[in-house]
């Protein structure tokens, strides 16, 4: 899901990653990522309850609440489908409350060569802001065709990855004992033209039998109990922004515990001026067809 949280406002504008943020991965070109990650991703539905952890800076807020509903399904054979909805309410004080409703659907093929996405954002009573497009790998570059918000075609460097591949590579790096991973990511967020440089910091593995201080539906699931997970923090940087004094501040950072089957728990979303937690409130495993 990591890709769909990126529209979250630092100025209490449109709230949402991603994925997403919380992002959930897929294979990259040639199917190497699937083998590297050591197993298929789990088809599932997860509900996250959002709440304000702390507020700071000039654009601080008084309160925040909301929910994220995330559905993930598919396989390396048929591709991966993600459905995401986030409804959030931000209170910036003096009676100013911003209500946002973001819905997105995406499909990414198992080889990481094709990515289709539709994103719709509504703010208060304003009209929706749809983004609709497709990205296809072609040799050493990626061709992007947008239908909305405007009809447009442009190219990206071939080293850029899509959201599912991003998570797949993080899992592969974690299995190899790596602690840092840099990737350039495209997920169609914002106006469909934004590209992000990401820095993932991976902590030590957490075995499935370790006692959990704050359990949730994923940790009590029989499917999940024996699985290893890793604490991960992914920072997203605007590729077009200029660094100040040699350093660049991330647009936002997302921390979470990432299971080896792609499920994420214990979300913490840091938007610089405020921090929001996403506690898993519900978790359901979905039926899926094995890859033949």
Which residues make up each language-model segment?
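Hydrophobic/aromatic-rich structural module bridging two neighboring secondary-structure elements via a short loop
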Residues: 84-137
